[in-house]
Regions:
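A short, N-terminal "cap"/entry segment at the start of jelly-roll beta-barrel domains
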Residues: 1-24, 34, 65-66, 85-139, ...
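Conserved short histidine dyad/triad with adjacent acidic residue
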Residues: 7-11, 21-38, 140-156, 190
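Short, conserved beta-strand element in jelly-roll/cupin
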Residues: 26-27, 37-53, 143-148, 155-173, ...
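Extended, compositionally biased flexible segments
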Residues: 32-73, 79-80
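Short acidic-glycine-tyrosine-enriched beta hairpin
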Residues: 57-75, 174-191
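Asparagine-centered strand-capping/turn motif at beta-strand->loop junctions
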Residues: 80-84, 198-199
């Protein structure tokens, strides 16, 4: 049930099958967003605003705010409301059916970005909100910071979706380039050579979710031409 909330699917990497599905959710003040996580579980991130999350229609509500990450195991119920003036804007990524491990928690779990340690790979920094050994055994959610410039082309062994939170840049992948700005969403299939270039003066800040889980630093560099 959305009751005034707006839900928009921006990417489905499996065309309705075993892929990652990214949705953007906007909950105005005075509205609510409730339901249950899909069969593979869902990773959420608060892009803007603040509000409250209850586990289903009962249970104690917890506050969520900008830069809060959430892991909802398969079938976990939720009810979200927005504080005034609103709206509460959420990123939601559904994992493939069967991805959620039976041993994962049965209720929603929260992770605050500011509480997570900074990790470094090359000149890029990231913080992992959820991943194997950190609340979600089957997928990883992280926020990365890319300084101005272009890194070497590389690929990853996992299936990844990236949402630009701040900054501007260019995605170099395949046979073409794609401009990036806040709200841009891209799919990086396993093994596809690519590079995210920061063409601005400030930091390019991105939200990544990939499956199966692991480290965002795991990559293979493309051979020199």
């Amino acid at each position: 049930m959305t009751d005034g909330a707006r839900v928009r699917t921006v990417l489905d990497t499996g065309a309705g099958r075993d892929g990652l599905v990214r949705r953007l959710v906007e909950v105005p003040a005075g509205s609510r967003f409730e339901g249950a996580a899909g069969p593979g579980g869902e990773l959420w991130f608060v892009i803007a605003g603040a509000g409250w999350l209850s586990p289903g229609t009962a249970g104690q509500a917890v506050q969520v705010r900008r830069d809060t990450g959430l892991w909802l195991p398969p079938g976990a119920g939720y009810r979200v409301s927005a504080d005034r003036p609103g709206p509460l804007r959420l990123d939601s990524v559904s994992l493939p059916a069967g991805a959620g491990a039976a041993g994962d928690a049965t209720g929603p779990r929260l992770s605050e970005l500011a509480d997570r340690p900074v990790e470094v790979t090359g000149d890029r920094r990231f913080r992992v909100l959820f991943g194997p050994g950190n609340g979600c055994s089957t997928a990883t959610q992280f926020v990365g910071e890319i300084p101005p410039g272009r890194a070497p082309e590389h690929s990853h062994p996992y299936d990844e979706v990236v949402l630009v939170l701040e900054g501007e840049g260019v995605l170099h992948a395949g046979t073409g380039d794609r401009p990036l700005a806040p709200g841009s969403c891209v799919h990086l299939p396993p093994g596809e050579p690519h590079c995210l270039e920061n063409t601005g003066r400030g930091t390019l800040r991105v939200l990544g979710v990939f499956h199966p889980g692991g480290s965002p630093a795991s990559k293979q560099h493309a051979p020199a031409s």
